[in-house]
């Protein structure tokens, strides 16, 4: 026994400390504490009791502007402190004009990120898992209100870690400055294509007008060529007639010379001077004879 007792070391009791160590306490919501100090001006804020059920709403001291209407059960309230400045946010019952909220897509994404961070911090601070059941009527009403008013919808499911799933439905409105694409083409390409199409149409119309002008000129040239051929034929015919008349005139002239020579030989030069009178008398006698023959 003595050997066994000598082999085992003796355990000395720990001395009781006169001053107990203070437990280290950490603030679960450092961002809320800073906002409360900024809101109350450094005064002692009121006590805050954590709820056993996770809520999508932020800290109650951040409710600066209360809503005038009471929302149905299950619809999260929208607070101006969580939204970006310059945006337009109305009651879920009142529809929002998409023309007055150009940056709704960015606002929806930022709201979902901010609510996700807030819900994560609350889920860490609350002990245990948080879960709440929403009846089917309230869930349908919440879905209808979120789809009608384009507000971020909050859906919760009973999970192991008790985290909340935040889902946002941003407005289907194009952000300002976005380039609208028509038929897979940018506006500049569309304008260039329209200009090129107009240029091609102008060239085509010019080609058509030039072709019609060539056809008109060709038809006129063919007509003139036909007239030229006709005139050439007529000219050849007239020349032939003139040549024949010239030949006949030459024959008459030669006969006249021969008759004149014969008269000179028969009557002499004096006979030629009396010849026209004699011819007239002879012609008159012939006419008288013809008249008498006709009467008989």
Curated annotation (Swiss-Prot):
Family annotation (SMART domains): BRLZ
**GO cellular component term, pick one:** nucleus
Q: Where is this region: Leucine-zipper?
A: 224-245
According to the record, the residues making up region (Disordered) are 1-27, 98-165, 190-223
The answer, when asked if Isomerase is one of the entry's keywords, is: no
Compositionally biased spans, kind Basic and acidic residues: 107-117
Q: Which InterPro entries match?
A: bZIP, bZIP_plant_GBF1, bZIP_sf, GBF-like, MFMR
* Low complexity composition-biased segments: 145-156
Question: Where is it mainly found?
Answer: nucleus
Indicate the segments forming the bZIP domain, all copies.
196-259
**Does DNA-binding count among this protein's keywords?**
yes
Q: Which Pfam families match?
A: bZIP_1, MFMR
The record's annotation in PANTHER family points to: G-BOX-BINDING FACTOR 1, G-BOX-BINDING FACTOR 3-RELATED
Q: What does this protein do?
A: Binds to the G-box-like motif (5'-ACGTGGC-3') of the chalcone synthase (CHS) gene promoter. G-box and G-box-like motifs are defined in promoters of certain plant genes which are regulated by such diverse stimuli as light-induction or hormone control.
Q: Can you tell me which family this protein belongs to?
A: Belongs to the bZIP family.
Output this protein's name: Light-inducible protein CPRF3
């Amino acid at each position: 026994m003595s050997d066994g007792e000598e082999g085992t070391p003796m355990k000395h009791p720990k001395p009781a400390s006169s001053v107990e160590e203070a437990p280290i306490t950490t603030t679960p919501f450092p961002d809320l504490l800073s906002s409360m100090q900024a809101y109350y001006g450094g005064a002692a804020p009121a006590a805050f009791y954590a709820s056993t059920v996770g809520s999508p709403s932020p800290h109650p001291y951040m409710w600066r502007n209360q809503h005038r209407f009471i929302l149905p059960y299950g619809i999260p309230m929208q607070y101006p402190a969580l939204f970006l400045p310059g945006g337009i946010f109305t009651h879920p019952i009142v529809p929002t004009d998409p023309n007055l909220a150009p940056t709704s897509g960015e606002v929806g994404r930022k709201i979902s990120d901010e609510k996700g961070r807030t819900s994560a911090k609350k889920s860490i601070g609350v002990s245990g898992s948080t879960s709440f059941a929403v009846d089917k009527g309230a869930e349908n009403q919440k879905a209808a209100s979120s789809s009608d008013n384009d507000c971020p919808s909050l859906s919760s499911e009973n999970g192991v870690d008790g985290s909340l799933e935040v889902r946002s439905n941003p407005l289907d409105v194009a952000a300002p400055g976005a380039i609208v694409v028509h038929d897979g083409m940018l506006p500049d390409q569309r304008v260039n294509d329209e200009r090129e199409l107009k240029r091609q149409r102008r060239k085509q119309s010019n080609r058509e007008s030039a072709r019609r002008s060539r056809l008109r000129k060709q038809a006129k040239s063919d007509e003139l060529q036909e007239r030229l051929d006709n005139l050439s034929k007529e000219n050849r015919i007239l020349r032939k007639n003139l040549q024949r008349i010239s030949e006949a005139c030459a024959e008459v002239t030669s006969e006249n010379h021969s008759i004149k020579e014969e008269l000179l030989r028969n009557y002499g030069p004096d006979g030629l001077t009396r010849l026209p009178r004699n011819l007239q008398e002879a012609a008159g006698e012939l006419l008288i004879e013809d008249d008498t023959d006709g009467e008989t």
